[in-house]
Structures are given as structure tokens and as C-alpha cells.
């Protein structure tokens, strides 16, 4: 049976992994680590929770330890929380070697980040927008070292290769060595057409061919076999009452859960409503200052909060192994988003539940999801109409009303409205 040493990782790194109680490589690690160490570009696709981070961090750290220079590798990822999580893993793995890791994301001090970059960290973990800002506005003493980077990693590559990130990604890549002078590693849980098209790109002169690997899941279902998928038919106007009843029913009253919503406004309403109802709750969405986002995650990981209300900021890659329940409070329009959300539970062989709240408007979305995952959802009987009306409706309605009044008083969402107005004004001036 293969171990990390036989895959080619440095002895010091295998000892670090052992100290973290990671002794057996996963399928994607077995496949990708030797190929990356050979110098090949790599596209790695695997289910969530399969160990993709170590698949690229392991060989990068091994090569760095042979030639420990500054700005050795750049990892780009779509969200701040993912960047911080990846940085934590790099730091933990390289702790015995005095590794310097810099996190460059929005919501943090630009000045402090510029100072960090001037110190030439060994690895930069960044979101494209903030790194692009430094490249465009900082001097050569800050970002000039990027031109010597040996590795570029796109984590959650299917998201980074969309039009949303196109301009910032292009700016980041422009500051790095050309393709034939660096290794490019793409990792994702969803192999999209854009990712596949890169497999057919011509091989760079003097470089070995690209290595592409995708773990096939049982029956081509992109979700863990230990995940139970259910739905509840819910009237739109009383969703909050159904949620409260579900979270406080006998089966789930002591379990950790992530509640996924489509809008920041919904996340904030639910957080405040559940807090009024004395549920230990935290939230994670783009309208929160970065420090609050970080604190929310820490509270949830430490079980100070039992429930995390989140937009899709939390659906990608975040490793919170103890999540026992995922609730799709709002159904996503993209079936792959459902897969990523549901992948926050039933990780590493554990059992988990994913329950979707289905209103009359969601039927076509549920059918699309079932087609994508090749599995039918079953209706759960954990919450009944009569139970909701009898136990929850009155107090939940009161708590929601008080939450909405408080949000109105605080002008929640005003910053976002002003930003949108500025963008629209700018478009008007250009047209």
C-alpha cells in the first residue's frame, strides 16, 4: 500500500503529516503527487473532502525545501475563507521548516499586505481581486518577486475560470512567469467544459505533457454514498417556522448544521430570527466585515455556534468535518452548487443529511438536481404542518418581525445599495 514517502514527499513533510494524523494518501493524492513532482502541469478533479489541498501542497513544499526561495508558489482561490484555510494547511505542514505564508484577500489592510509581500513570503495564498489590486498599484519591490514563482495553483478552478474572475485572473497571471517557465496546477470538485478544454491545449515546448486525473464516483453520482438526501414541501411564507421546527426537533436539536441561502438579506434575517429564538447561530455572507466572517467560522468550528447560516461563500472547500446536517433553505439554480453545498456534510466517510426546502416555485430546479446527481430525493416526515402551526409559527413570526425592524433601524444593506448605485452611475457616464 502506497504511503506519502513512497509517493516522493520529503521525509520532514511525511513526519509533519504523521503529526497531523494523516498517514494514508487518498486517491487523488496517490495519482497527482508523483506527477507534480515530475514537473508536469496537472488538472485534478475529485469529490469534496478528498484531500485536494495536500495533493498540491505536498509536492510544492517538497520542491521548495530543496531550494527555499521567496515567492515560490502562488495559490489562487475564489473566497477569503478558502484562502485562509489553505494557508493554515501550508503553515501547519511547513511549521518545522520556518515557512512564510502570506494571505492576500479583501477585507484586510492593504498596507499590511504590501509589507508582507515585500518580505518575499515563500507561498502566497490569495483571492484574484486583491492580488490583482497589489499588482496594479504596488511597486516592483512589492510584487516583482512573483516573476520568479515556480508554481501557480488554481483551487476551485471551475469558479476561477468563469467570467466573474476573468479580468483579475488575467492580471495575476501577467505578473507570473510564462507557462513554459512555471508549473500550473488546477484542482476542482467539478470538471467543467472550460476545465476540460485546457486538457487539449498544446504541450509547451520543453515541458512534459499535462496530467489530468478525475476520481470517478460510484454510479457517477457526484455526492458521497453516506449522504442522505431529502426534501420538505414548504409554503413560501412560513419557511422560517419550518426551519426552526426542523432545527429543534428531537433528531437535530443537538446537531451542527449549515443553512444555505441565496441572498445576504435572507442570511441576516435568519441569523437574527434564530438568535431571538435562543438558537446558537452564526452567519457567513459577503456583507459582513472580514473579521466578523472569520469570527463566525471560528465560533462554528469551536461549537460555540451550533448553526451556521451562509450564502455560497461557504459552499466551496471549507473543511468543517463535524457538520451533520445541510439545509438548502433556498434551492440553487445550478445543480453543481447543490452538490458543493451538500458536500459540507458526510465528509471523509461520515454520515450526513442534506434536506431541501421545496416551494411551489422550486420543482423544476429539484428535477434538474436529481438528473445531475442521478438520484431521487425522498420526502422527509421530520416536520409536519400541524406541528409547525402548533409549536413554532407564532413565536417565529414575532421574532422575524422584531429582526426586520432592527435591520431597518440599522440600515442593513445600505453599503451594498450605495455600491450598486455607484456602479450604475459609472455605466451611465460611459454610455
Curated annotation (Swiss-Prot):
Residues 411-431 have a biased composition (Basic and acidic residues). It comes from the Eukaryota. This is ATP-dependent RNA helicase DBP8. Its EC number is 3.6.4.13. Interacts with ESF2. The Q motif is unique to and characteristic of the DEAD box family of RNA helicases and controls ATP binding and hydrolysis. Optimum temperature is 30 degrees Celsius. It catalyses: ATP + H2O = ADP + phosphate + H(+). The keyword Protein transport does not apply. SUPFAM superfamilies: P-loop containing nucleoside triphosphate hydrolases. It comes from Saccharomyces cerevisiae (strain ATCC 204508 / S288c). Present with 3500 molecules/cell in log phase SD medium. GO terms for biological process: endonucleolytic cleavage in 5'-ETS of tricistronic rRNA transcript (SSU-rRNA, 5.8S rRNA, LSU-rRNA); endonucleolytic cleavage in ITS1 to separate SSU-rRNA from 5.8S rRNA and LSU-rRNA from tricistronic rRNA transcript (SSU-rRNA, 5.8S rRNA, LSU-rRNA); endonucleolytic cleavage to generate mature 5'-end of SSU-rRNA from (SSU-rRNA, 5.8S rRNA, LSU-rRNA); maturation of SSU-rRNA; rRNA processing.
Amino acid at each position: 500500500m502506497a504511503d506519502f514517502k513512497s509517493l516522493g514527499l520529503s521525509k520532514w513533510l511525511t513526519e509533519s503529516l504523521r503529526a497531523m494524523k494523516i498517514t494514508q494518501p487518498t486517491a487523488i493524492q496517490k495519482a497527482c503527487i508523483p506527477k507534480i513532482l515530475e514537473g508536469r502541469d496537472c488538472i485534478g478533479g475529485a469529490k469534496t473532502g478528498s484531500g485536494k489541498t495536500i495533493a498540491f501542497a505536498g509536492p510544492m513544499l517538497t520542491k521548495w525545501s530543496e531550494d527555499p526561495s521567496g515567492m515560490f508558489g502562488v495559490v489562487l482561490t475564489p473566497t477569503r475563507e478558502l484562502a485562509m484555510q489553505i494557508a493554515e494547511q501550508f503553515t501547519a505542514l511547513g511549521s518545522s521548516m520556518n515557512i512564510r505564508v502570506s494571505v492576500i484577500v479583501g477585507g484586510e489592510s492593504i498596507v499590511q499586505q504590501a509589507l508582507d509581500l515585500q518580505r518575499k513570503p515563500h507561498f502566497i495564498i490569495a483571492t484574484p481581486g486583491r492580488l490583482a489590486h497589489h499588482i496594479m498599484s504596488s511597486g516592483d519591490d512589492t510584487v516583482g518577486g512573483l516573476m520568479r514563482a515556480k508554481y501557480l495553483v488554481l483551487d476551485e478552478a471551475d469558479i476561477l475560470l468563469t467570467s466573474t474572475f476573468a479580468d483579475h485572473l488575467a492580471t495575476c497571471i501577467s505578473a507570473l512567469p510564462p507557462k513554459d517557465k512555471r508549473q500550473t496546477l488546477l484542482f476542482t470538485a467539478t470538471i467543467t467544459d472550460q476545465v476540460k478544454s485546457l486538457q487539449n491545449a498544446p504541450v509547451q515546448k520543453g515541458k512534459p505533457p499535462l496530467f489530468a486525473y478525475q476520481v470517478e464516483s460510484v454510479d457517477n453520482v457526484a455526492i458521497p454514498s453516506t449522504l442522505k438526501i431529502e426534501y420538505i414541501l414548504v409554503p413560501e411564507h412560513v419557511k422560517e417556522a419550518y426551519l426552526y421546527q426542523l432545527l429543534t426537533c428531537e433528531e437535530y436539536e443537538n446537531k451542527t448544521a449549515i443553512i444555505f441561502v441565496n441572498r445576504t438579506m435572507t442570511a441576516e434575517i435568519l441569523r437574527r430570527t434564530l438568535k431571538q429564538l435562543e438558537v446558537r447561530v452564526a452567519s457567513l455572507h459577503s456583507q459582513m466585515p472580514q473579521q466578523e466572517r472569520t469570527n463566525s467560522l471560528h465560533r462554528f468550528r469551536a461549537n460555540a455556534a451550533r448553526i451556521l447560516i451562509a450564502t455560497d461563500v461557504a459552499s466551496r472547500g471549507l473543511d468543517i468535518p463535524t457538520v451533520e446536517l445541510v439545509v438548502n433553505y433556498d434551492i440553487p439554480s445550478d445543480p453543481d452548487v447543490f452538490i458543493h453545498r451538500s458536500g459540507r456534510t458526510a465528509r471523509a466517510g461520515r454520515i450526513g443529511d442534506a434536506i431541501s426546502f421545496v416551494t411551489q416555485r422550486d420543482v423544476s430546479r429539484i428535477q434538474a438536481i436529481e438528473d445531475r446527481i442521478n438520484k431521487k430525493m425522498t420526502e422527509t416526515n421530520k416536520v409536519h404542518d400541524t406541528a409547525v402551526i402548533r409549536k413554532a409559527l407564532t413565536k417565529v413570526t414575532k421574532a422575524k418581525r422584531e429582526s426586520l425592524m432592527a435591520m431597518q433601524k440599522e440600515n442593513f444593506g445600505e453599503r451594498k445599495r450605495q455600491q450598486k448605485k455607484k456602479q450604475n452611475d459609472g455605466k451611465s457616464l460611459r454610455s
